[in-house]
């Protein structure tokens, strides 16, 4: 990578963030597309967020990515939000359009792009969890024409989850069904009629636990996805593959949400296949 007086910056902003794989992905992409850019990780305190956003304009940056805890906190400092960012209520990408700062959320698009030969339009989805990643998948599915969504959370989280689903219905007219994860017969019934089953919880990061009981029977055409990529194959995905179902981990979502951001910043397509190869070598 050659840096000079014309090099434009992009950064990921979060706390903590030094462990991030985003600089690896984006700097590879800058190099592969002969784009004069550099991507760094900025670990900042909340009190520095306003100044950090102001620096996007000040230094004529491409923009920034955001991770926890700043995806929602950044919104008041932006000029405009995309449809999906408004629906999700969180921003993971800020684009500098001639000094106008526009907030996007590329997580949902990245998720659906990483699913092999699958489109969500007209399909039924069962989603486990209702955190940040789940919200982005939910909102994008609705924007892309999903026909039915069943969200399962632990019964203690149902009250906390409902207001967001009500807000989604108010803004889109789409009603999401909310169910308790402990209700195994309901879980089985919903999965049986689904085209896509997604684990958007952190259950499985320990390499031992699974978000669903192993006696659940999966329909043979069901695609199973997990947003976790470390471990590369969670117990949930192993279980799905043992039933003969296609199963996808979260590494593709990480890559394709980055590719969406890269295109918004540069107008260029990220060479995802080439970078995917490097990522799988790193994590497999």
From Swiss-Prot:
Gene Ontology BP, a term: aromatic amino acid family biosynthetic process
Pathway of action: Metabolic intermediate biosynthesis; chorismate biosynthesis; chorismate from D-erythrose 4-phosphate and phosphoenolpyruvate: step 4/7
Domain of life, source organism: Bacteria
InterPro entries in UniProt: Aminoacid_DH-like_N_sf, NAD(P)-bd_dom_sf, SDH_C, Shikimate_DH, Shikimate_DH-bd_N, Shikimate_DH_fam
Annotated shikimate binding sites: 20-22, 67, 92, 107, 229
Keyword annotations of the record: Amino-acid biosynthesis, Aromatic amino acid biosynthesis, NADP, Oxidoreductase
GO molecular-function terms, A-Z: NADP binding; shikimate 3-dehydrogenase (NADP+) activity
Chain positions recorded as NADP(+) binding sites: 83, 129-133, 227, 250
Active site: 71 (proton acceptor)
Entry annotated with the keyword Amino-acid biosynthesis: yes
Record field: catalytic activity: shikimate + NADP(+) = 3-dehydroshikimate + NADPH + H(+)
Pfam family, one: Shikimate_dh_N
Family: Belongs to the shikimate dehydrogenase family.
Free-text function comment from the UniProt entry: Involved in the biosynthesis of the chorismate, which leads to the biosynthesis of aromatic amino acids. Catalyzes the reversible NADPH linked reduction of 3-dehydroshikimate (DHSA) to yield shikimate (SA).
Description of how the protein assembles with itself and partners: Homodimer.
Record protein name field: Shikimate dehydrogenase (NADP(+))
Organism: Streptococcus pneumoniae (strain JJA)
